[in-house]
């Protein structure tokens, strides 16, 4: 039987919260005896929004806002059943989107 890999993709607006969640997942997986590849930083997506400053006529006066989405990738190679149980019980901070794929 071929061993399965677990690919975890994390997204967040705040990179500090994202890095903390990444280290929590990596420490949990290492503690249960699984091999880890990563964390791999993926490109940050920057969305920019331009709006008029005033409600009336002044088209030349504008303001720009941006939203940055930071991403990280973790590969867990040869996960043990204890690894899967520990990851299911792990409580991560709010604001971190977690996508898990079995490969």
Swiss-Prot record:
Cite the Pfam families for this sequence: Ribosomal_S10 (PF00338)
Parts of the chain that traverse the membrane: none
- Taxonomic superkingdom: Bacteria
PANTHER family according to UniProt: 30S RIBOSOMAL PROTEIN S10 FAMILY MEMBER
Tell me the Gene3D superfamilies matching this sequence.
Ribosomal protein S10 domain
Q: Which UniProt keywords apply?
A: Ribonucleoprotein, Ribosomal protein
Name of protein: Small ribosomal subunit protein uS10
Asked if the keyword Ribosomal protein belongs to this entry, the reply reads yes
Quaternary structure, per UniProt, is:
Part of the 30S ribosomal subunit.
Cellular component GO terms, alphabetical: ribonucleoprotein complex; ribosome
Record's function text: Involved in the binding of tRNA to the ribosomes.
Q: Which InterPro entries match?
A: Ribosomal_uS10, Ribosomal_uS10_CS, Ribosomal_uS10_dom, Ribosomal_uS10_dom_sf
Homology family: Belongs to the universal ribosomal protein uS10 family.
Organism of origin: Sphingopyxis alaskensis (strain DSM 13593 / LMG 18877 / RB2256) (Sphingomonas alaskensis)
The terms under GO molecular function for this entry are: structural constituent of ribosome; tRNA binding
Q: Which GO terms describe its biological process?
A: translation
NCBIfam families of this UniProt entry? PRK00596.1, rpsJ_bact
């Amino acid at each position: 039987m071929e061993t399965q890999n677990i690919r975890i993709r994390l997204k967040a607006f705040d990179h500090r919260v994202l890095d903390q969640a990444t280290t929590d997942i990596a420490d949990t997986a290492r503690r249960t005896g699984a091999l880890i590849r990563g964390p791999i930083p993926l490109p940050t997506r920057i969305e920019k929004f331009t709006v008029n400053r005033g409600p009336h006529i002044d088209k030349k006066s504008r303001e720009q806002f941006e939203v940055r989405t930071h991403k990280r990738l973790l590969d867990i190679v040869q996960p043990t059943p204890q690894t899967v149980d520990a990851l299911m019980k792990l409580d991560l901070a709010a604001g971190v989107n977690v996508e898990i794929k079995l490969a």
